[in-house]
Amino acid sequence: MQPVPSDPNYGLLRSLFQDPNNQCCAECNSANVPYVCIKLGVFICPTCAHFLSTLGFKVRPIMGSSFSEEDISRLQSIGNLVSKQFWLARWTPMDIVMPPPEDPNLESFLRLKYIEKRWTSSLSTSDGFSSPNNNNTSNVNNINNNSNHNNNINNNNNNINNNNNNNINNNNNIINNFSNINNISNGMNNISLNNINNNNNNNNHYNGNDIGIPIVHKTQSQPQPQPQPQPQPQSQGFSPFNSPRSSPKPGRHHLIDDLISFNPTPVNNSNNNNNNNNNNNNGNNGNPLKFSGGIPQNNNNNNNNNTTTTTTTTNNNNKVPFDPFSPIKTFSESGEYQNTNGNQQLSGSGNSLIDILSHPTQSKSPSPSGTPHSLSPQHHSSDFKVHLIDIPTTQQQLQQQQLQLQQQLQQQLQQQQQQQQQQQQQQQSPISNPFTSNNNSNSEPLVSILDKHEDLHNHHHHQQQQHHKQQQQQQQQQQNGNNSPLAQFNQIQQQQINNNNPFVEEKQPHQHPHHLQHHRHHSTSSINHGSNGDLASISLTLLTPSPSPSPSFNYSGGVSSAPNNSLNNSCNGNNNLNNGMLNFSNLNIGGSTSSACSTNSSSNITIANNINSSNNINIINNQNNQNNNNNNNTNNVMISPSPSPNPFLPTPTSTNQNNHIITPIPVNPFTDNLQLNSNNIRQHPQQMYIQQQQQQQQQQQQQQQQQQQQQQQQQQQQLQMQQQQQQQMQQHYQQQQQQQQQQQQQQQQQQQQQQQQQQQQQQQQQQQQQQQQQQQQHINLSSSAPLQSVNHSPIPLQPQHSSSQYMNQQGYQVYPNVGNQPQSPQQIQPQPLQQQIFQQVQQQQPQIPQQSPQPLQSSTDEDQSVLEVLNLKKLFDMNMMDKEEFEHRRRQIIDNLTKTTSPIHQQPPQPPQPVLPVSAPAQVPQPHPPQQQNGPTVPQQQQQQQQQQQQQQQQQQQQQQQQQPIPQPSSSSPTPDARLTGTERVIRHRFDAKLGKWVQTATIVITEPTPFAEGAMRKAFRMKDLSAEGPSSQMVAKLFKDSNEDRMVYFKDVEMQTYSKEIAERFNLKSPPKKIDFVPAFVMELVERQGKPFCAVEYFIEGKYEKHNNNFGYKNDYDRNTPQAFSHFSYEDSGCQLIVVDIQGVGDVYTDPQIHSADGQGFGKGNLGIEGIKRFFSTHQCNPICHYLGLSSVNPKPANDESGTMPRPPSIGQSYVRPSAFPPNLQQSFSFNFPPLKDHHVLEQLNQQQQHLQQQQQQQQQQQQQQQQQQQQQQQQQQQQQQQQQQQQQQQQQNQQQNQQQNQQQQQQQQQQQQQQQNGHPPPQTPLPPTPQQKDKPKIEVFGDILRKLVS
């Protein structure tokens, strides 16, 4: 990932990004960190960047972004490690478990941190800390304690007095006068030290306050200017870290000034040269101060013999710009300290505190980030090192301090009473928190919050035990009195170190001296420095390591009166100076100490330098002071500096005696340290959280394993169940097969039995037939048979194999022979007249397959045959059929009655041979006695010969067809239609094309119930008009197969055929070679039927029925000229508005046409509009008749093609004159007018013109749509206005419509003029534009007038 290469801060940003501590997200520990949040000063992953952006933080990507110096300083001062340690000090996994990186609950966790401020709710400002106040000072008043004191100080170099307890009297009033301490944090807390007076009078104990000792300061220390804090916007989210603008980075000498920023009363110290050869009792006086992060392992006993006492003054306006999240500067701006004495220069050996502060050396500890020094920033979060300071203090300095304090006691006794009163008032008032703001807010201090989470949690179980041990030790000390107080102090102090320090192993107390002391009840100790000590007046009570990266100073303004103070002040002239480890990242600053036990500091580890003095102080330089050298600090295990190493792990020290720099081991607290195997290391809450997660994962794995085992068991059970089911299914299937086999065997047996029975029955039937045929007599039918009042049509079905001129030859059907009879053309039995007889026939039909056909044995069958013959004779007498058809049908009835014919397979139909009729049976029912008919008879000899031949054929075929199924003849026969049966009265509707209306007349008709032909949509029935005579009485009724068809369809079809007839008449006026005509059609309303149904009726046409074209471009193979020319003529005759197609009929007499209109409206379902017109011309070829009529040439036939009808030569080339007027109703159906067409040579130009017209029409339509939209908008605006405005709009719309109409009329007139000028009319090859033509309705004229106009 590379930012902008041209960025001047590119190198710093690169080193920050390559830091291992910044490689993981500061919020979720994800490995991908392509984003940064400048406000928080951390590197984050894309998921956390998204969540933080939703919470109001500004997030920017590293790739392609530029960073200012302030942004880089922000990232340097904080970084991911500081941020993580800050939150770990406040948050524990026991409170709320941090979600993993991919968990959606991570957003709610971040919301708790930054929006709801769950763990930082006690902070006063949006940054989590109180705002800085540069002028805020707190005065620490003089704390005076009245007591009896002795001024006798014996400076004897030879006396040895180790029993100081006998000479301990009431202590002097030692006043620690602090005034005008201006401690200014770097934007964190305003530190105010309140006046607290703690008096504790114990017998035989030192009772006094901390001794105020003058400190060496810079004489001309200028206050550093503090930048004004900039208010942060509230919408950008909460940040616990301050802006780098208000956080100056102090150097090392500034940090020391912060610790010694007290202004005690100046004391004139005498320059006394004391020879201290062996003055390192319980102290490391020869150790140089180095900011090395630890304490050297061995002590140097060589001390400086000459010490100089200097008097310095401090600036009251001294400021402490300390940023807890900023690293310590490695080099000060001034470069060195100035010596205020002027008489003696500072030591240049580099071993003193001043030399190191004035000439700092670069730390030799390796950078944890591994970044080269040239690329590493000056202040980096990973290079944040907190150094431990060794405080060199000698006995001579102690004596000088005591002398100065005794001189100050006299001056301070006068002010004691006033101070006590002030102290009492302050004790009654609540103690202010030094880390809270001046607004008296209840927010909890930062350092106490940081220490309280971890230290209380880890060391709470030590409190009761330590308190009990301390009480026992105090009681024993009081009982013993003056018996070896130094030994008691050393033992008790060592026990306290071993018990109170959680970082020192309890099993090895001898390795850890008494330099560590834990104060759980706010007991304090004073570090008394010599006159030449640079940190002489610092009273450091608690220097506690904390898991928080923030500092924790604890300035004690008074000494607690707890019993432990006696232990701290019980040494006789011994310095008891331990190397106090000053962890500047964990300094606990306290305004005062109290005698009450406080849990806020019970977990703090106090590392104090206790200097015990009494009124009679014997300072011994030469003798017996070496006895206390056993208390030197050797093999120290130091507390790890924060924040780089883990504060819960010990820091190994270097064994190099020359170089006292202790290199801290960088330990990442967020990762497991597998190399540390110590048993006494205290477990971090994060490690506990990791263990909990591991336990949860193990439990989840166990649960998953259990679930998998359960699933496997379930699957096994399912497999077993499936196998059992399959076995059951197989058994069941086998049983079913066995049952089926048994059933089949039984059926076969039954069939064999039935066949045997049928054979016996057939033999019996043959014998009976022979007997009956011998007894039959011939019945002669005559035309004088009485006519009965029949209500139904007697017309039987025309046989399909007959050669009648009225039947279509394509519907021939052959059936297999029935029973053992010889094969003959199977004839469909005629249907009875009455409905009852028809039902009886249907009931008898299922018995035919079971038994072979038998001759008629009952009187019912004979009656049916007789009635059919009588009805047939009646129709013949009424001239409804000719003699040939009559004879054919009569023979059919006789053949069906006698069963003497058989069908012939796969042979074309042959004309029937003249067969004499067979006499009807003699038995005739009484109600209808049969009448004999005059006609020829058949001799009995011929009849016997035929019977013998039939018997022989039956015997030959009987064996082959015994098991063949017998078909039902009635199943293939058309069923009669109940709508057309018998004779009835009807109303005939005839359309008059001249008048354009329907005319109704009443008549009587007789129809047959069964159709003689069927089409795709309709059935054809025979009908006769009894009111007419001759051929006009023969008609055909056409009914739709769908009884729910709309009635108006019949009227539309008749109307369309009437229009075609009118166009055919105009076609005949052109004198074509053959004239054409359309059969007149009517609509019959059957008023006597239920529901009064309608049917289309037209005159019957005799001859061969042919179809020349259809409504979708079909053309007959013969391609006659006249029908095709008529369709072409109808298109141009109608002004290119319609075309007549679907020409079919007999000869040139056509019927059932179809009309395509340009608008696609009207003329029934077959009207295909423009598409139908295009289909016709796609297959049409202009023939000579088209040229004769003067029609436009479209795909003309070759000139040498002389097939078809040819017109007369003189008439070729004549132009067709369109009639001036059309029938009124026909004119109404023409809703579009097509533009004139030119010759076929300019068809391409026409196509272009048509396309141009189409584009114009589209533009017009678009304009109209736009106008409509504008009108709609206007209407919406106008609806809100008054009614008057609405009326005006309506008038405007009317005017627009009138203008449009006028424009359309003008266009139509122009088009008509162009049509008259042009002669050619070729049909279009592309879709014609639908330009409507509105014509005025002409007056109704007589057909004769129209003919006159046409002729003229």
UniProtKB/Swiss-Prot annotation:
Compositionally biased spans, kind Low complexity: 268-287, 298-318, 619-636, 821-859, 931-965, 1279-1319
Lineage, broadest ranks: Eukaryota, Amoebozoa, Evosea, Eumycetozoa, Dictyostelia
Protein name: Alpha-protein kinase 1
Domain Alpha-type protein kinase, residue spans: 990-1194
One GO molecular-function entry: myosin heavy chain kinase activity
Region of interest called Disordered, as start-end residue ranges on this chain: 123-164, 219-380, 424-445, 457-484, 503-560, 619-658, 786-863, 901-979, 1198-1234, 1279-1352
Polar residues bias: start-end ranges: 237-246, 329-352, 359-379, 799-812
Family: Belongs to the protein kinase superfamily. Alpha-type protein kinase family. ALPK subfamily.
Binding-site residues, ATP: 1164-1169
Biased composition (Basic residues): 458-470, 510-523
UniProt entry tagged with the keyword Metal-binding: yes
Any matching Pfam family: Alpha_kinase
Organism from which the protein derives: Dictyostelium discoideum
Biological process annotations from GO: myosin II filament disassembly; protein phosphorylation
SMART domains: Alpha_kinase, ArfGap
